[in-house]
Regions:
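Short, charged, solvent-exposed linker or helix-capping segments at domain edges/interfaces
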Residues: 107-109
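Structural motif
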Residues: 57-59, 66, 82, 92
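Short, conserved beta-strand element in jelly-roll/cupin
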Residues: 33-35, 44-60
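A short glycine-rich, His/Asp/Glu-containing loop-to-beta-strand
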Residues: 6-42, 98
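Short acidic-glycine-tyrosine-enriched beta hairpin
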Residues: 64-79
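Ligand-binding loop in jelly-roll beta-barrel domains
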Residues: 79-105
Length: 109
């Protein structure tokens, strides 16, 4: 069992990173705080990812589909599917990205 504070997690780029393998959990999570115009490059993971948008607006591409999402949106991304998001709003984008793996694996395209 672990009790953690978000500020105890590593902050890399634009996200606090929860690595499940370090906590005995079967998943990993990113707590995203992206400034306008920010987002990762097009990439894939060998597992499902679920993005929960908490605040802000993003343009999300999953495969050939591009949509605008905002607070309350949930995006389910199949394994090995190219995807990315960019903060397309004027304020901060906050989202929680759940990775169905205790170890984070990403291939940038």
């Amino acid at each position: 069992m672990s009790f953690l504070n978000l500020n105890e997690l590593p902050f890399v780029g634009m996200s606090y990173q929860f690595h499940g393998e370090k906590q005995g959990a079967p998943f990993s999570a990113y707590f995203v705080n992206a400034k306008p115009g920010r987002g990762p490059p097009l990439h894939t993971h060998p597992y499902v990812e679920v993005e929960f948008t908490l605040e802000g607006t993003a343009t999300v591409t999953v495969g050939d589909d591009t949509r605008e999402v905002n607070a309350g949106s949930i995006v389910v991304i199949p394994a090995n599917t190219p995807h990315r998001f960019v903060n397309s709003g004027a304020g901060v984008l906050r989202q929680i990205d759940i990775h169905a793996s205790p170890k984070f694996v990403q291939t940038n395209l």
